[in-house]
Amino acid sequence: MIEKFNLGLLDLLSILLPGGFLIGLAWQSGWLEDWPMLSGIPEGWASGAVFAASAYVLGHFIHMIASYLDELVFEKIKEKKWPDQTLVKEVVQIKDSEIGEIDRKHFNAFKWSLAYLMQHQPMMYQAVEKHIAESKFFRSFLIVLLVASLWAFVQQSWLEGLLSLGFAFLSLVRYATQRQKSIESAYQYVIAAKGKGRQA
């Protein structure tokens, strides 16, 4: 129960924090000061509620844009840094034996592994989901930091821009490593679970 709450909180923060950070950046730049929707809001809890709701909505758009990094960036990093296909080939064989051959574009080995663990090994699925949630957070934060660095350079704030780029690089590293951990963990858990099933 506590583990599910922690994962839910991490998922929420992966949406809320990047959105809140970007709204704060826009407010600091003066873009939102004359926005009609915000001019009539009183101080106090109402303004906080509007900020939280706006951050949540904006965070979803950031999440949607950031999801394209999986194919555009992560897959290229994976080919160079983690080229070994042993685990995925083993899982594909297990998947094909369970549900037959399906076009990988529609139902790849990773998606099937998550579905299998969710149905048959929920504790293993939660362990994988932790890596997924963390990778999503840093994936979204990477987009925010790139926007922040661009804004800083436009304002000729060179130090802030370089710092934002540095943190963006660290976010990219963390996103890629956690994404890879989630994939490897899912494959390993499926192989281990099927091995136990055969022994039983």
What spans do the regions from the language model cover?
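Charge-rich cytosolic interhelical loops and cytosolic tails of multi-pass membrane proteins
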Residues: A66-Y125
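Charged/polar, solvent-exposed surface patches and flexible loops
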Residues: E71, Q126, K130, K181-Q188
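Transmembrane alpha-helical segments and their cytosolic interface motifs
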Residues: E3-L17, M118-L162
